[in-house]
Amino acid sequence: MEESGDTCELTIVIMTVHAVMLESGFVLFDPDSSMRFSFSKKTLVSLNYTLPSVKGIVGLNFEKEAIVGSFVRVVSIDKRSYVHIVDLLMETLKSDEEEDTLSIDCKVLVWWRMIKDGIVTPLLVDLCYKTGLELPPCFISLPRELKHKILESLPGVDIGTLACVSSELRDMAS
């Protein structure tokens, strides 16, 4: 990626999204050779993923140009929307103070959740829905009205705790 004029920030964004995709059960897929676990030789800023038991493909594009092909869904990730977070993480990592360790862990967790909640889980739900697979057991796959009913039945303390889990729950809890 560095050879293609990439910056450190783009590398961090791509590697983080890639790690969250793998952690969620996705595998890399090269649509040209129909091989799994393969990086495309054309470009490393457009990655294609699938699930082990699925033929559908989701594409992630880290550039502005469109991806053409037979994808279930394509997501374009604008690195500029994540660069400020990467800069914050890099700044915190440079600190030598021990008390910053908790701060670093917290920021990395927030970064991970942001990628998981905003990109990966919606892709997973969409791919499962469109290919007929059973949806993953997650709150996000429930209809909005049902989510509201569930939240209404919870005590305020529990709603406050749920609001810390994801941005979607935080928005719903407010």
From Swiss-Prot:
Pfam families: F-box. InterPro entries: F-box-like_dom_sf, F-box_dom. Residues 136-174 form the F-box domain. SUPFAM superfamilies: F-box domain. PANTHER family: F-BOX PROTEIN SKIP22. This is F-box protein At1g70360. It comes from Arabidopsis thaliana.
